[in-house]
């Protein structure tokens, strides 16, 4: 019997990729980095979970850890500004959450994004989705290994006190789907 519905990423709740792509480009300009991500380029980079991980992978030796952190922080500031007026949830997600709750399922948000990003998304979606009643929310700070490692899902299962076969995960990238599958969760 299914006991929990685990939402695995921001992209399951709302479409933010374009806002994040623009925020990265703003950060690149602000830090004098001669990069510009068009839509196709940014979509390819989504194969690597985690903004700082993407920058590290793409920058190679060209960017220091401190530069990566600063660029990402500026990106986060620009992203926060773009979310200030709120955002719409993906079509059908509110209805899915309502039906899951009506069926007695516990809802979880199992992500390895930063607590700051979670707070921004929570606020931006607050007119549509109340994340305060989610049974579990994980972040990057809760695990040593980020997705595609299954640690975040294993933690969520532990916090919920359920087995992997009692949950269903919804993810929006192959890497993130791999995390759920690694933890033995249907996705």
PLM regions and their residue ranges:
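N-terminal helical cap/lid subdomain that shapes the substrate entry/recognition surface
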Residues: 2-91, 102-103
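Generic enzyme active-site microenvironment
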Residues: 6, 169-170
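Substrate-recognition element of Asp-dependent hydrolases with the DxDx(T/V) motif
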Residues: 24, 93-124, 180
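Short glycine/proline-centered loop/turn elements that form peptide/ligand docking sites
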Residues: 13, 95, 173-179, 187
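Substrate-recognition "cap/lid" segment bordering the active-site pocket of phosphatases
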Residues: 114-168, 174-178, 182
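Conserved SAM-binding loop
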Residues: 13, 89, 107-110, 145, ...
């Amino acid at each position: 019997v299914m006991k929990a519905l685990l939402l695995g990423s921001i992209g399951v709740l709302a479409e933010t990729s374009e806002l994040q792509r623009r925020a990265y480009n703003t950060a690149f300009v602000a830090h004098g980095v001669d990069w510009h991500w068009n839509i196709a380029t940014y979509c390819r980079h989504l194969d690597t979970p985690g903004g700082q991980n993407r920058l590290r992978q793409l920058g190679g030796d060209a960017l220091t850890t401190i530069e990566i952190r600063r660029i990402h922080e500026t990106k986060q500031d620009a992203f926060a500004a773009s979310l200030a007026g709120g955002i719409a949830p993906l079509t059908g997600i509110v209805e899915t959450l309502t039906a899951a709750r009506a069926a007695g399922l516990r809802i979880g948000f199992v992500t390895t994004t930063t607590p700051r990003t979670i707070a921004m998304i929570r606020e931006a979606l607050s007119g549509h989705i109340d994340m305060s009643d989610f049974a579990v929310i994980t972040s990057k700070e809760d695990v040593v290994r980020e997705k595609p490692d299954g640690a975040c899902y294993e933690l969520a299962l532990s916090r919920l006190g359920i087995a992997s076969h009692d949950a269903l995960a919804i993810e929006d990238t192959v890497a993130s789907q791999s995390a759920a599958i690694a933890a033995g969760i249907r996705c």
